[in-house]
Regions:
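Catalytic core of pol beta-like nucleotidyltransferases
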Residues: 2-110, 119-125, 136-214
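Conserved catalytic motifs of the protein kinase core domain
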Residues: 128
């Protein structure tokens, strides 16, 4: 690993970053094949990058058996003081983003859900953050609409993320699901609850405001 500007070496390769992120989340050594699976890379690409990371001293290789095992070298100061804190902050950043959105709407929303490419883990730099906000009635929907522009601007300014909201009353949501409209089906199948009442409870008419998702 270079002494001057080591981040240039590490973060110039997206595949290496994926591997390091996965290794940072486990204390147990993994095979190259398992690392490839977790990082959503081909086995060959994963091994090439693991070899390179081993040469920098960031990754340890354990020899033995048919498959070599790999782990993050947690005694390495660059790993301890730079990489692990960066990945921890990366996860915290998403939680902070979701918290900001929830805090703006939780006083009157029935449910707040994230769906689309972000919920599927398939987002790209060009992707919007799709949020579905379900409210009790039309009057509440109008209150939400008045807040939307300022929230969109704040999210863009602080996180560089383009927010795309869909606002629905509980009745609109139930009707859309019952009529098997594709957008509503996608929300049912892939969404993650950020705040409030679950989709199942809404469909059964048991919506309650003020309940935060864990």
């Amino acid at each position: 690993m270079t002494v001057n500007n080591p981040l240039n070496e590490i973060f110039s390769n997206g595949s290496a970053v994926r591997i390091l992120r996965q290794l940072a989340e486990t204390m147990t050594p993994v095979t190259g094949r398992e690392c490839a699976r977790r990082s959503n890379l081909s086995h060959r690409t994963a091994l090439e990058n693991l070899n390179g990371l081993e040469s920098t001293g960031i990754v340890n290789r354990i020899f033995g058996g048919r498959d070599h095992l790999f782990s993050l070298n947690r005694e390495n100061l660059f790993v301890k003081d730079v990489l692990i804190p960066i990945f921890e902050q990366e996860k915290k950043l998403k939680r902070t983003l979701y918290r900001l959105i929830v805090d703006h709407y939780k006083d009157i929303a029935t449910s707040i859900l994230v769906f689309g490419s972000v919920a599927r883990g398939e987002d790209t730099p060009e992707s919007d953050l799709d949020i579905c906000i379900i409210v009790p009635d039309e009057s509440t929907k109008r209150k939400i609409e008045k807040r939307t522009v300022s929230v969109l601007l704040e999210v863009k300014q602080k996180f560089g993320v383009t927010l795309s909201n869909i606002l629905l009353t509980e009745k609109e949501f139930r009707n859309g699901v019952d009529n098997q409209i594709e957008l509503y089906q996608n929300i049912v199948n892939e969404s993650k609850l950020l705040f409030g009442t679950s989709i199942k409870e809404i469909m059964h008419g048991k919506a309650l405001t003020g309940k935060e998702s864990k």
